Amino acid sequence: MALIVQKFGGTSVGSIERIEQVAEKVKKHREAGDDLVVVLSAMSGETNRLIDLAKQITDQPVPRELDVIVSTGEQVTIALLTMALIKRGVPAVSYTGNQVRILTDSSHNKARILQIDDQKIRADLKEGRVVVVAGFQGVDEHGSITTLGRGGSDTTGVALAAALKADECQIYTDVDGVYTTDPRVVPQARRLEKITFEEMLEMASLGSKVLQIRSVEFAGKYNVPLRVLHSFKEGPGTLITIDEEESMEQPIISGIAFNRDEAKLTIRGVPDTPGVAFKILGPISASNIEVDMIVQNVAHDNTTDFTFTVHRNEYEKAQSVLENTAREIGAREVIGDTKIAKVSIVGVGMRSHAGVASCMFEALAKESINIQMISTSEIKVSVVLEEKYLELAVRALHTAFDLDAPARQGE
């Protein structure tokens, strides 16, 4: 008998019909002998609706009171699912984050989990009940309701699995696993049977929407086996684990991630003096703008060009800050480009194989795709290119690294 934590997102519980379907799935697992803790999000769109209500009162809701409002969304779904389970003869009980003492810090709207008191949950499991817990929320040391921010329900599920030492944390979504890339771009993309935490963390940070990065970090830290599954289709999904595959068939590259939300800024004619990088990026950091990739050209005539990328939503703000910096340090000009994209190859196989970056560059060159920037890590190579070439680049790389070949045995 296994202890499983199951997490269902907003689309999975987006209607009464879907909640009934989730109840059937949970019932089948319980009948198979598993002990179950089920974590739920609010119904799809409900959190936004609640935030909109708050903003009808004030443009800047008090963070503490906003947490009180938005936390009610999960209370609705946990009660409805618990009712649906009891109707089916499955003993069940629902709890809010406060009731099971998911203790967080006091950073309202973006709180971090500090500790979980698992005694109440363990007592219910011992009595044969399915425990249904509200995701996305907790309580601070003062008794105030807190919410965990983006990806919070995934994080709740993983944190509960870690506290309970669960055999597996299952994340149910609208996809049936982690794919080598987005099947909408490459129809030949394959579902991965397994992927490491390290690879998944890179893919999540690079724009993969399957799992939120905080939950992957948490799972990796506490070695919680994660499995991504489809809410309403049967299948093995994808297991995310700390163990690296030791099969001879293991590909060098596990997946290709891409991001359309990048923008590039270049400050030209910068006096080539010590500390110039700080003079440029210091004000950017002080403006709370996150920088991704950075390139500084070789100095020429005692001046240099400095290029970096930011999220497209931060482009105008970053451009304004950079133009002020350019005037202060005597740079020639600032130019920007919002029509770029980032494409990355990810795989632990890079550690033991040389020439991976060269293969990537060759595949792009064959399609006459110019590379504007390059960034590497131990298991990742990222490039920036013109946005119009994004899908062509992804397809070319998918083929070059044999990712659209027939699935390996076991998939």
Swiss-Prot record:
GO molecular function, one term: ATP binding
Ranges for domain ACT: 265-348
Pfam families given in the database record: AA_kinase (PF00696), ACT (PF01842), ACT_9 (PF22468)
Catalytic activity, EC: 2.7.2.4
GO biological process annotation, one example: homoserine biosynthetic process
One GO CC term on file: cytosol
Family (UniProt): Belongs to the aspartokinase family.
Official protein name in the record: Aspartate kinase
